[in-house]
Amino acid sequence: MSLHLCPCQATNPVSGLRAGVFGWLREDLAMAYSAFITEFLREAKVPRLSLKDPPPDERLIAKAAEAKDREITGEENSNVGCIRSLLFLVAGELDQAHRLAQEIPTNAGSYIHGMVHRIDDDFGNARYWFRRARTVPAAAEMYRRAAAASVTVASHPSWDPFAVSDMVEASRIDGVSDELRAVLTVEFEVLLEFLCKTTED
């Protein structure tokens, strides 16, 4: 099953990644997700760089709000709060994403909390919550995929959310590169995949 966010214009030199208007997403990830999430991601524009890039999608926000927990995950999964928070985040509803993340006392909850503040340009707060996460969920896989798409990520010995925050902060002045979009898409997809496959972080 292929996962397309929008009509593909080109293929990334990194195997398995395809380019769309808003970034990169591997085509084989549908196997990791429930039917609800797979369909949600087909309609979403990933990654989210800021509240306005891409614009919030009110229809997807409503879908994330109205779906039952079991509908989202397809089975019992204690990470459903984190998963719903990520769906709100990518749809552009930061208040709901923040509300859910701050109520979840896990590494994943803290990490998503940091992602929300990073999107909202509150970089100091983002770094605080990345530190609170202690360990990054699925960090090794996040690094493996992102390093293949980014010289900047590959220059570090492991996944570094602070370095990624620096990249995002710099993009507010220098503009958003395809490299940054690829890195943020990998971050989102690996974290979501991890949460869907496990029941705790």
List where the protein language model places each region.
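Cysteine-centered motifs
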Residues: 6-8
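Ala/Thr-enriched low-complexity intrinsically disordered regions
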Residues: 10-11, 19
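Short, Lys/Arg-enriched N-terminal segments with co-localized hydrophobic residues
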Residues: 17-30
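N-terminal alpha-helical interaction modules that lie
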Residues: 28-103, 132, 136-201
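Short, charge-rich amphipathic alpha-helical segments embedded
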Residues: 99-121, 138
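Conserved alpha-helical segments that form or flank metal/cofactor-binding pockets of metalloenzymes
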Residues: 123-132
